[in-house]
Amino acid sequence: MKRTDAADREAEASDAHSAQSQSTAPRASRWRRARDNIWPSWTTRDMGFLLAARVCMSATRALAGVLVPIYLALIGYSGFALGALFAVVALSSAALTALIGVLSDRMGRKIFIVVIPWLAAAAALVFALTRYGPLIFTFAALGSFGRGAGAGAGTVGPYQPAEQALLADAVYARHRNSLFGRIAFASSLGALIGSGPLTVLPGVLGRFGLPVTHGLAPYRFSFVVLAGMSLLAGILAIPVREARPVRDPVPAAPVSGQRWRRPHLRLSAKTRPILYRLWATNTVNGLAVGFFGPFITYWFFRRYGAGASVVGPLFAVITLAAMVSNLLAARFAAWLGVVRAITVSRALQAVLIVPMVLAPTFWLAGAFYLLRMLAQRMGLPLRQSYVMGVVAPEERGSVAALSNLPSQAASAVSPTAAGYLFDHVALALPFEIGALLQAVNTVMFFVFFRALRPPEESERRQPAP
């Protein structure tokens, strides 16, 4: 009996150890899955630096999106004057984006990811130190202040084509949607920081006796913080290693008697039709966004009297919720197909503008804006990834820049008209016009691209050998 009891106790101990091991294994497995979802094995050191730089630069864009419209309104800018400023910013950003996109395919991408944030830092210091109109217009244009305003204002400015091309070159096609989802997540994280903690920082410091809470002092202090974040974004990109794309050799000089032709940008026969269709859809989208995109903060300020300390936290809450969309973007595309997923996202963006501008209270309008941003933040990385996937690697920087050029140029046309409508007609009308144009853009995008699949979807549909 003693021997049997000992054996029973040993068996019970063994079973307990086995059960503990089995219960520990799922926990370890869940931890590994969670870790892999956040930082998969295919990510690299350079991706980490670029994502960190994206967080910092996105934070500055989000903070500027809250500060600039309200600050300029407080120092006397009308809706029409704001529209003129945003038009100048859109034109300069379009020119810079096109130039950087083309040059990045030839000179390399890293230099622009370092220098452009430092231009934003200089612009922030100018806003902090002077009200002189020509300086404000000039440096707003150089720093791209006035683009990407609103919750989740995580754009990073004119260097985005260079950044997209550098990141797209670093992964296999099957991982590209996931990588761009993480880029969008980093943008949302930066926007969360910029529109949340950084907008309330002056008030927090004021509780400790610092003189940064009266008059325009909170705005000027925040511009100095913005400059510091922009400097840090450029510094973080310095350690990134870049492999230059291999291009076809330069053609030999023409032989005697042949007519010399000025060299110009050449894209492959496969890429040109894609670019033309992107130009058409992005032109309409640029017109739409120009009517309301730069004015989101200004509209909340005019419609509900909400200042930066109220609008900023609202944007932070919206951005926090929208971050989930970034990480689900790849699954959404795998379920519907990337073109259908982008189409659904754009349709929702157009529809949800209308109840937002008709909402009687600030927080109800904020709730509709939240729903719209959930759709927008899911569609944005998919569109960027899709464009990078359907063009040749050596043309990605050029296409990323050139495809957005009509959008940025068109978005320079509508802000001035929107500003006039804000001042003289109705606050809701520019938003309603923008919603109609976005609906047209949605139909155009689906018609133009429904038959053009990215490589990862084409590979899945090929029959096994």
Where in this protein do the model-derived segments appear?
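Hydrophobic core of transmembrane alpha-helices in multi-pass small-molecule transporters
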Residues: 55, 123, 133-159, 166, ...
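Transmembrane alpha-helix termini and helix-breaking/packing motifs in multi-pass membrane transporters
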Residues: 69-70, 74, 191-217, 298, ...
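Central cavity-lining transmembrane alpha-helices of secondary-active solute carriers
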Residues: 84-102, 316-328
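Helix-to-loop junctions at the C-terminal end of transmembrane segments
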Residues: 96-108, 202, 325-338, 422-423
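Structural signature of the two symmetry-related core transmembrane helices
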Residues: 111-126, 340-355, 435
